[in-house]
């Protein structure tokens, strides 16, 4: 296995969350083993772009991946954590760079090792210096560069590593158990905080996602785009943002293509999952499905009808078991043309 040093940084949103999550995702790869993690640092941005400070760290990993394979997987991890490459050296949820790959020196179109900016960046070198041995090829060069950069305008200081979101949820669940009169240390509840934290990660998996990207568009004969494309009975579940109780049901989604553009059929259920797997209300889910589909396709019309059962209605308050809430949203021809709207509604009977 090859010893590799990675530099990581984040300056958007919950910075430590993105760093912890990136470490977790990297470590899940069967050909990557996380050996050491540096302290967490806060640094001022470089490059002239006005933006928030960064949280940085370094990783020492052992890998069986070749450099370009590793780079490709790193890009997958960055993409999964909402990395957008809009501004060079600009703000980002996560940035992962290969700094050193054993003693390798290489230069290809999209990868230079050692990283070409490494010896100009205090936030890269100081965390890595924690992880290297004195016999490392670049030890003396790193030590010298740190001494020189420490008197520059680059600001860097160690910060406290925060608990991961999962750890924070576990602590909160223990407090709730105490507050309702339970004993978190009794046998039946010992694993409950961890189970609840894992459950929240699963059912609120879209909570930190800023954009729906899981779709592909196709072209068809534009003369055949007057008919309705409908997928009905799409199951969904979500959690009410008012009481954090579940609600679940079915979504029915239709659109009329324009300019020969259609979306892969499996992507509409994925869109329903995306908008529902976060704290929300049914009205927002209904509108979000329609608005996002409109942004993607710019179709002639969109129709959405959602039917849901709400535990905040059935288990508390009025306690009306089996009651159904229906919400609808119409855009374009479905809003303006009664016949199209009725065709959609009658197809659901």
Curated annotation (Swiss-Prot):
Database matches in PROSITE patterns: GTP_CYCLOHYDROL_1_1, HPPK
Region (2-amino-4-hydroxy-6-hydroxymethyldihydropteridine pyrophosphokinase): 1-226
Region (GTP cyclohydrolase 1): 226-349
Pathway participation: Cofactor biosynthesis; 7,8-dihydroneopterin triphosphate biosynthesis; 7,8-dihydroneopterin triphosphate from GTP: step 1/1; Cofactor biosynthesis; tetrahydrofolate biosynthesis; 2-amino-4-hydroxy-6-hydroxymethyl-7,8-dihydropteridine diphosphate from 7,8-dihydroneopterin triphosphate: step 4/4
GO biological process: folic acid biosynthetic process; one-carbon metabolic process; tetrahydrobiopterin biosynthetic process; tetrahydrofolate biosynthetic process
Alphabetical UniProt keywords: ATP-binding, Folate biosynthesis, GTP-binding, Hydrolase, Kinase, Multifunctional enzyme, Nucleotide-binding, One-carbon metabolism, Transferase
Family: In the N-terminal section; belongs to the HPPK family.
SUBUNIT field: Homomer.
Protein name: Bifunctional protein FolKE
Species in which this protein is naturally found: Lactococcus lactis subsp. lactis (strain IL1403)
Gene name as annotated: folKE
């Amino acid at each position: 296995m090859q010893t590799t040093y990675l530099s990581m940084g984040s300056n958007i949103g919950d910075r430590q969350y993105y760093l912890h999550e990136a470490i977790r995702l990297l470590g899940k790869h069967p050909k990557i083993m996380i050996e050491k993690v540096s302290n967490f640092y806060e640094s001022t941005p470089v490059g002239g772009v006005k933006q928030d400070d960064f949280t940085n760290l370094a990783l020492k990993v052992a890998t069986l991946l070749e450099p370009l394979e590793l780079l490709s997987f790193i890009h997958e991890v960055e993409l999964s954590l909402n990395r957008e490459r809009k501004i060079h050296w600009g703000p980002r949820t996560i940035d992962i760079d290969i700094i050193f790959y054993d003693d390798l020196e290489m230069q290809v179109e999209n990868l230079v090792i050692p990283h070409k900016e490494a010896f100009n960046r205090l936030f890269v070198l100081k965390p890595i210096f924690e992880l290297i041995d004195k016999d490392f090829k670049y030890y003396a060069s790193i030590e010298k560069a740190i001494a020189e950069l420490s008197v520059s305008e680059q600001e860097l200081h160690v910060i406290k590593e925060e608990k991961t979101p999962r750890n924070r949820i576990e602590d909160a669940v223990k407090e709730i158990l105490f507050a309702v009169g339970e004993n978190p240390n009794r046998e039946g509840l010992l694993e409950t905080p961890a189970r609840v934290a894992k459950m929240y990660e699963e059912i609120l998996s879209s909570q930190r996602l800023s954009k729906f990207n899981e779709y592909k568009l196709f072209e068809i004969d534009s003369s055949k785009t007057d008919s309705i494309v409908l997928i009905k009975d799409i199951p969904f579940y979500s959690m009410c943002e008012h009481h954090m109780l579940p609600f679940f049901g079915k979504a029915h989604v239709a659109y009329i293509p324009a300019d020969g553009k259609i979306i892969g059929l499996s992507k509409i259920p994925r869109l329903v999952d995306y908008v529902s797997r976060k704290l929300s209300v049914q009205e927002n889910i209904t509108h979000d499905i329609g608005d996002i589909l409109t942004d993607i396709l710019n179709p002639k019309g969109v129709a959405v009808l959602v039917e849901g059962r709400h535990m905040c209605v059935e288990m508390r308050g009025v306690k009306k078991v089996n009651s159904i809430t229906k919400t609808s949203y119409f855009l374009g021809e479905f809003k303006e043309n009664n016949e199209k709207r009725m065709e959609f509604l009658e197809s659901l009977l």
